[in-house]
Amino acid sequence: MTPNGYLIFEDESFLDSTVAKMNALRKSGQFCDVRLLVCGHELMAHKAVLACCSPYLFEIFNADTEPQGGVSLVKFDDLNPDAMEVLLNYAYTAQLKADKSLVSDVYSAAKKLKLERVKQICGEYLLSKMDSQSAISYRNFASSMADGRLLGKIDGYIQDHLHEISEQDDFLKLPRLKLEVMLEDNLNLPGNGKLYSKVISWVQRSLWKNGDPLEKLMEEVQTLYYSADHKLHDGSLLEGQAEVCSTEDDHIQFVQKKPPRERDEMGSGASGSISPSNSQFNKHEWKYIASEKTTSNSYLCLAVLRGLLCVISLHGRTSPHNSPSATPCVLKSPNFEAQLEDLQEKLLKPMHYARSGLGTAELDCKLIAAGGYNREECLRTVECYDPKKDCWTFIAPMRTPRARFQMAVLMGEVYVMGGSNGHSDELSCGEMYNPRADEWIQVPELRTNRCNAGVCSLQNKLFVVGGSDPCGQKGLKNCDSFDPVTKMWTSCAPLNIKRHQAAVCELSGYMYVIGGAESWNCLNSVERYNPENNTWTLVASMNVARRGAGVAVYEGKLFVVGGFDGSHALRCVEVYDPATNEWRMLGSMTSARSNAGLAVLNNVLCAVGGFDGNEFLNSMEVYNLEKNEWSPFIEALGKN
């Protein structure tokens, strides 16, 4: 007896005994109210048990208001019956037992049923069994499952073991794009990923603008030209045609439109066949994975081209022709090229995906980079950078693909609001990331769709300010605050000037809204919000009008980097001192970056991603306050 007069007894064996009996009832078909038909095989179960385990089945059962004969029927035509039986046993006993040959099928079934914990355990098991012989097949599987976290770990393994992997049958059977790169005198191919980014840009241009199928590009050796100013040109430039390049607006169109021709790219033959399984993969993925030097001027690269895992063979040879560039340029010596390769090893680790219009924030001494868009798609993947290990890892992806949004940390959790999903749809929905559970949770929607809005945490509330109208052409004055306790949105005083793509940040209890654009005209004006009296005040204007800039508080001041001035992506940086109400210019970044992310990580200012006017970036660089300079090297990260 307890002092309050209640009897309290806990039977430690009851739970195990009960679930064992329930599982026995399931196997004998007793009291079952759901029939699972898996590829013609019938499995009986109890809806209450399955609904507690599987969000997918919960939604189905919740919508099934009139089951025939009191028994619901759910059909699965794409799952392994044995794998489903494994998951049913898990649902009843909390024990996962699967033969090693069945793990990938269990993973697929867990993904379908939204059993995230089981999916994660199966993924970790597969990784533990991966070797150079199985790496390619594992990568194909992870791609077919669209598992960004698993892909990231497999790609990391491939980068470390490419030489051994390249000797395996699975690698040798991959489709192959053969390139001959013409070089100016005294030039060598650079041994870094930038060359392959340019190659991927060329492939995309051929597929999108010329309508050539990928299979056709792989039929013959393709000729490209690498000039002394480190630009890659189409081989037809030798006959005077245009350079391989494009603008950010072109890239944004790629995000919103489907290709002019969608084909099932099927070939035959061991040397370059495109397998049926590959054709089912995500056709929107473009990625450089790894490369190795095979001879003095030849490289082997593993990449993903429009969702297809393939090999790119590059061989460089001196061009008998003159440079197609109209601008004279200084030739770099082979020694200089070798120095570039040495420096490449010391560069800060790039993100797995190039991203522009992404959300970034510092959380628990790590850098979070979420969503954004690249040349092909709007992303939902999220990466986390650990400065101690200099590595990016995937965390749980967002529920919705989104770009052109901002991110803020409030009460130890990450919030994202609005943006665009890449299909010309402005978003009103938002999400919150719980780092303890590694999951994204939906939050109450905004009252209106908001793309290119600023997001900021201030006085334990989340503020969303400005943004673009539904047509995406005019800025808004709207300002709204969200209370995470009451889950309610409240309208605040509007801005003085309509703005979209403004940089927004909190400093000393005030919210600053910096630059942006009213329609297409970029702004240099800055407004400051006082939450105590709900008023906006104009403060000193920036030196450079810009939209899509990054902003962060560093050493008690506002640092604004990059952006777009209406004509060019910017490298320039300026800082605002609230004590003097003045802006001054600082050292420029090493790369122009529009719509990049900016955050302070371990007292170091870090810029990541963005668009440089020609390419989407996955690189990072950091600022040295004492030297007033930016650097992309690991050494600079530790010396700030």
UniProtKB/Swiss-Prot annotation:
Residues 32-100 form the BTB domain. Residues 267-278 have a biased composition (Low complexity). Its main location: cytoplasm. Keywords: Cytoplasm, Cytoskeleton, Kelch repeat, Nucleus, Repeat. Residues 135-186 form the BACK domain. GO terms for cellular component: Cul3-RING ubiquitin ligase complex; cytoplasm; cytoskeleton; nucleus. Kelch repeats lie at residues 366-412, 413-460, 462-509, 510-556, 557-603, 605-640. It is found in: Cytoplasm; Cytoplasm, Cytoskeleton; Nucleus. The keyword Cytoplasm applies. Gene3D superfamilies: 1.25.40.420, Kelch-type beta propeller, Potassium Channel Kv1.1, Chain A. InterPro entries: BACK, BTB-kelch_protein, BTB/POZ_dom, Kelch-typ_b-propeller, Kelch_1, SKP1/BTB/POZ_sf. One of its GO terms (biological process) is proteasome-mediated ubiquitin-dependent protein catabolic process. Pfam families: BACK, BTB, Kelch_1, Kelch_KLHDC2_KLHL20_DRC7. GO terms for molecular function: ubiquitin-like ligase-substrate adaptor activity. Residues 257-278 are annotated as: Disordered. The keyword Glycosyltransferase does not apply. Plays a role in cell division and in the dynamic organization of the actin skeleton as a stabilizer of actin filaments by association with F-actin through Kelch repeats. This is Influenza virus NS1A-binding protein homolog B.
